[in-house]
């Protein structure tokens, strides 16, 4: 069964996370970014470092369409108002760089997500993990807000 993920912030890190999840058993069920979907589609499709996205990418007024799959896009500035529950997002990748404090990241949980992965150093997460260093320390029973240490570390 695929894990359902939402992405808050579809800038460089959000798009790279999307690319990394595209060929895994992970389903991106929603994206939140203040930029209109047409521009997000262009940025996903054409990457000057990693090359073009290996699939089809287009946009509707409120969604990206990637390889024929429609992914809703919202433009909420308040994470508590992003429809994660409605979209079925169990995990949210927080990649805006704005919601790195626990109190701010908790808004994603209030909106229906079960877990938040912060792509930047966080002030007070449940745990900070670096893949290959301490990722075995992850405890799903008590770690709901996880810091990825730094988007340039992993």
Regions found by a protein language model. Give the residues of each.
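N-terminal Rossmann-like NAD(P) cofactor-binding subdomain of oxidoreductases
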Residues: 1-154
């Amino acid at each position: 069964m695929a894990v359902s993920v939402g992405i808050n912030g579809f800038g460089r890190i959000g798009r790279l996370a999307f690319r990394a999840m595209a060929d895994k058993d992970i389903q991106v069920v929603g994206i939140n970014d203040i930029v209109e979907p047409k521009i997000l589609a262009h940025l996903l499709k054409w990457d000057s470092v990693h090359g073009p996205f290996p699939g089809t990418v287009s946009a509707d007024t409120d969604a990206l369409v990637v390889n024929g799959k429609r992914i809703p896009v919202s433009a909420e500035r308040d994470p508590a108002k992003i429809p994660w529950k409605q979209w079925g997002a169990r995990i949210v990748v927080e990649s805006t760089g704005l919601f790195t404090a626990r109190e701010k990241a908790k808004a994603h949980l209030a909106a229906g997500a079960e877990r938040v992965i912060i792509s930047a150093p966080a002030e007070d997460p449940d745990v900070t993990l670096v893949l290959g260093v301490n990722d075995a320390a992850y405890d799903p029973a008590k770690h709901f807000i996880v810091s990825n240490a730094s988007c340039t570390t992993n």
